[in-house]
Each structure stands twice: as C-alpha cells, then as structure tokens.
Amino acid sequence: MQTTTRTLTQHKRIALVAHDSCKKNLLNWTQKHKEALKPHILYATGTTGHILERETGLSIQSLLSGPMGGDQQLGGLIAEKKIDMMIFFWDPMNAAPHDPDVKALMRIATVWNIPVAINQSSADFLLTSVLFEQDVEIDVPDYEGYLKERLA
C-alpha cells in the first residue's frame, strides 16, 4: 500500500486506556505528568476516563467502557485520524473478555502508524521525546490511493 503523510500538531490528541488491574498505575502516571498533558486533547475509554477526570481534574473525552465498545470507538477515531497517539497500560497476565477488541485496537494503531506506549516506561519515553511538543509528520496509508486501486 502506498503512503502519504499526516501532521501531528504540537497539541496532540491522546488516548489513555488501561485494563482494570492497571488503572491505578495509569492514574499515578497521569497525575505525575498532569502539567505536560494539560495542553493536549485527552480521550479515554469509559471507566478509565471518568477516574482520570475525577482524580486529576483534567478534561477527558470519555468513550464507552472498553468491553462495551470503547476500544472499537477508539479504533474508529484512530482510523479517522482523530487520535494522534495512545497510552495503553495493558495487563499481559490476565485475559479479558474483550481481548479481540484490544487486538483490533492495537492493529489499527499500527496500520495508522500512531505512537503507542504500552507501559509506564514507554509512556515516559514518549512524553519526554523532543517530538512530543512539536508538529511531526508521520507516514500513514494513502486510503484514497488504496480506494482508487480497489475500484479500478
């Protein structure tokens, strides 16, 4: 598939997601980085978003809870280029009923080439990157070209 570019502006649209056993870790991480996150537009799956907003005072756009379709909503926003990066504290030790949704979410994040952090260390690296506060060009699939090919 051909690619084109997309600009991630200095004010990022960031998805915050955590499995149940990791919500406290994500809350602690978010509290620690509250000032750095403030200028950005934050999204989260339902329960996580409500906890983060209540405990940090940050404005969070809460979607549905992950198992109720929130992971798929988030994937749709990624495909629509409405999410620039994702912080997803996931639990690799416990199976969840919505594991197929999580796999689909990670697949879409990979297809659309957005930066993804899957634990505290990678989230710290992402947030402290010199690119975090800048406009950044990323390669993304050329959907228009893909569609033209398919319809030819």
Swiss-Prot record:
Which CDD domains does the entry mention? MGS
EC number(s) given by UniProt = 4.2.3.3
The residues annotated as the active site are: 71 (proton donor/acceptor)
Q: What does this protein do?
A: Catalyzes the formation of methylglyoxal from dihydroxyacetone phosphate.
Its top-level enzyme class, in one word, is lyase
Tell me the protein's name. Answer: Methylglyoxal synthase
Q: Hey, which family's this protein in?
A: Belongs to the methylglyoxal synthase family.
* Cellular component terms (Gene Ontology): cytosol
Q: Keywords assigned by UniProt?
A: Lyase
What InterPro entries does the record point to?
Methylgl_synth, Methylglyoxal_synth_AS, MGS-like_dom, MGS-like_dom_sf
Single GO molecular function: methylglyoxal synthase activity
The MGS-like domain is annotated at 6-152
Instruction: Quote the gene name from the UniProt entry.
Output: mgsA
- Taxonomy of the source species: Bacteria, Pseudomonadati, Pseudomonadota, Gammaproteobacteria, Pasteurellales
- Which Gene Ontology terms describe the biological processes this protein takes part in? methylglyoxal biosynthetic process
Catalytic activity reported: dihydroxyacetone phosphate = methylglyoxal + phosphate
- State whether keyword Transferase applies: no
Q: Where does this protein hold substrate?
A: 19, 23, 45-48, 65-66, 98
Tagged with keyword Magnesium: no
Which NCBIfam families did the record assign?
MGSA, PRK05234.1
